[in-house]
Amino acid sequence: MVLLNGCSQQKEIDKYSSAVWNSPGGGSINYVYRYPDKLKKDKKYPLLFFLHGSGGRGSDNQGQLLDANSIGAFKSQRLFSKHNSYVLAGQVPEDERWVDVDWASKDHQMPKISNSMKKTFEALDTFINDDKNQVDIDRIYIMGLSMGGYGTWDAIQRRPDFFAAAVPICGGGDKSIANLLTEIPIWSWHGDQDQVISAARSRDMDNAIKKSGGSPKYTEVKGRGHDVWLDVWESEDLWKWLYSQSR
């Protein structure tokens, strides 16, 4: 995986466009986006909707890329050249979460949509519906880690027919409504030694979806703690699988 720092990191950040979404309901949220390297007229391209972890919160509109070196992973896996993908990533303010739940809880019921999720959905919808963007609405993917792993489960349970595939990393969802997720391709990841968010959260969701008739994928990495995203970043199989999915 590409490790970026100093000048190389800033050069990569500068390839993303920064924006602010002003919600019709009040308030705003920062987000960044990037286009595929090669755009051809009258052709559509996939989009990755990325949800950062707690370390990416703030107001600089860069933390969502620097958190867990996601920006390095996107570069290493050649999202913009090999996969010719769009990426859009919102930034949660310092005192908010993607999902308003206790990360240490054994389970939870899906709460009211958070301010950050609501506004980032609005920004995403506007981006997709903008005529100048060539987004393939049948190839919109979602991925998130830790706090963003919770956000990924939350997003697909709110919009089960919207995404073509999902990769929740060390998060947790509402297993009581797992039946909503039987049709969407999901590959969840967790470290079996995670002391921040129990691997049982991912395991329980995987089992609940299977009991409801779905066929999700789940990887539990032995000996890995909370930073299981490192395994995701380097998994060629995961990225190949993700970009092969279509709604």
Residue ranges of each PLM-predicted region?
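Short, proline-enriched alpha-helix->beta-strand connector loops that line the catalytic pocket
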Residues: H83-S85, L181-I186
